[in-house]
């Protein structure tokens, strides 16, 4: 099982960062390796989203069910994809009116096989830089 824990302190509100991370369809604009993203269903408390990843000739897609607690947490659970196990969460901790700690925690493992090994390398590269990508996107949208 692979675990990823990343965080950043940003001069933006928890609301701004929640909205940015929850804008799944914008991911291909700023997330390295994400070539497609779509919201399949949303009702305000939950979102079903699909991400298409591609890098180095390897492509994989997966779908998550996201539980939304506005401006606090987005919990991710796997609906469909190459994983044996997958769970995670984005957390938004307000530190002041215009300061927030954003955190990403992911735990995942892939099904066996050669394709899974390639998918694991792709996913490791993409997820390892997610928080950095969100930081850059926030600076682009909200200023520095």
Q: Residue spans of the language-model regions?
A:
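Glycine-rich portal/gate segments that line the openings of hydrophobic small-molecule binding cavities
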Residues: 38-79, 133, 137
């Amino acid at each position: 099982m692979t675990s990823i824990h990343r965080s950043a302190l940003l001069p933006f509100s928890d609301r701004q960062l929640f909205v940015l991370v929850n804008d799944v369809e914008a991911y291909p604009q700023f997330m390295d390796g994400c070539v497609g993203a779509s919201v399949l269903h949303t009702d305000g408390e939950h979102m079903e989203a699909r991400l298409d990843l591609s890098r180095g000739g390897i492509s994989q897609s997966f779908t998550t069910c996201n539980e939304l607690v506005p401006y606090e947490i987005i919990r991710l659970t796997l609906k469909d994809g190459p994983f044996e196990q997958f769970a995670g969460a984005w957390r938004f901790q307000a530190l002041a009116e215009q300061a927030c700690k954003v955190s990403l925690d992911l735990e995942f493992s892939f099904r066996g096989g050669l394709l899974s090994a390639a998918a694991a390398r792709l996913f490791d590269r993409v997820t390892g830089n997610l928080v950095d990508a969100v930081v850059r996107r926030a600076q682009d949208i909200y200023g520095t």
